[in-house]
């Protein structure tokens, strides 16, 4: 099986959002760094995905902000970079074609935010026929509040929910240690 690791939206833009929290960042950075090293050691492709949108001038995701760049801890070489403007890494990016040209049939998902661009990319990848390994501890998300009723959900609860809805249908749920051991 030929694999590629997708490192989704791990970019400076998030430092400038109202929901940014450093609570889980150290573990996320450690796990993602280990995961990238394991993929590179095993000669698998590592793909950087950046989210940009130019329709909102003052957004930290607008390229003019200067924040649409990898977080500093991602100082390693990537095999390819794709830019997206929607919630998944496939729509209008050329990623699927590139993966197929490189005979890649399995993608591992990592990055920011677990339940948004990472989960959405996993679902689309599955629909496109790729095997998907969702590396939950190499994803990052933040606490959220459900607007209609005010209920708060912690980041760890959101991750569990993401695993629940992806497992056995869209993805195999993995941990970083599954790749480095």
Predicted feature residues:
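A short alpha/beta connector and helix-capping loop motif
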Residues: 19-48
């Amino acid at each position: 099986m030929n694999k590629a690791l997708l490192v989704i939206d791990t970019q400076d833009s998030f430092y400038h959002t109202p929901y940014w929290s450093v609570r889980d960042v150290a573990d996320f950075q450690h796990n993602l760094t280990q995961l990238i090293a394991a993929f590179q050691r095993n000669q698998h492709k590592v793909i950087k995905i950046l989210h940009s949108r130019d329709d909102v001038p003052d957004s930290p995701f607008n390229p003019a902000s200067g924040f649409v760049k990898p977080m500093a801890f991602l100082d390693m070489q990537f095999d390819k970079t794709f830019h997206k403007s929607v919630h998944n890494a496939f729509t209008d990016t050329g990623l699927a074609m590139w993966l197929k040209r490189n005979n890649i049939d399995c993608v591992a998902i990592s990055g920011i935010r677990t339940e948004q661009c990472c989960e959405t990319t996993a679902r689309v990848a599955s629909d496109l026929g790729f095997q998907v390994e969702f590396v939950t501890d190499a994803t990052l998300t933040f606490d959220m509040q459900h607007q209609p009723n005010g209920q708060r959900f912690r980041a760890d609860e959101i991750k569990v929910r993401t695993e629940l809805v992806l497992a056995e249908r869209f993805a195999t749920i993995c941990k970083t240690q599954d790749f480095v051991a």
